[in-house]
């Protein structure tokens, strides 16, 4: 679930951008985050 644009995601990847993929460490126990490309920079902003 996403907050308004530019804000953080809420423990899921519904607001991952077009060039990012979803990463859920420890089986999603602490939620998921969006990762852009190969930089492994976690992006958790709404698009």
Curated annotation (Swiss-Prot):
<keyword id="KW-0964">Secreted</keyword>
<keyword id="KW-0800">Toxin</keyword>
<feature type="disulfide bond">
    <location>
        <begin position="13"/>
        <end position="46"/>
    </location>
</feature>
<comment type="similarity">
    <text>Belongs to the neurotoxin 37 family.</text>
</comment>
<keyword id="KW-0528">Neurotoxin</keyword>
<comment type="function">
    <text>Neurotoxin. Causes spastic paralysis and death in mice by intracerebroventricular injection at dose levels of 3 ug per mouse.</text>
</comment>
<dbReference type="GO" id="GO:0005576">
    <property type="term" value="C:extracellular region"/>
</dbReference>
<feature type="disulfide bond">
    <location>
        <begin position="24"/>
        <end position="32"/>
    </location>
</feature>
<dbReference type="GO" id="GO:0090729">
    <property type="term" value="F:toxin activity"/>
</dbReference>
<dbReference type="Pfam" id="PF08396">
    <property type="entry name" value="Toxin_34"/>
</dbReference>
<dbReference type="InterPro" id="IPR013605">
    <property type="entry name" value="Toxin_34"/>
</dbReference>
<feature type="disulfide bond">
    <location>
        <begin position="15"/>
        <end position="34"/>
    </location>
</feature>
<keyword id="KW-1015">Disulfide bond</keyword>
<feature type="disulfide bond">
    <location>
        <begin position="9"/>
        <end position="22"/>
    </location>
</feature>
<keyword id="KW-0960">Knottin</keyword>
<feature type="disulfide bond">
    <location>
        <begin position="2"/>
        <end position="16"/>
    </location>
</feature>
<protein>
    <recommendedName>
        <fullName>U18-ctenitoxin-Pn1a</fullName>
    </recommendedName>
</protein>
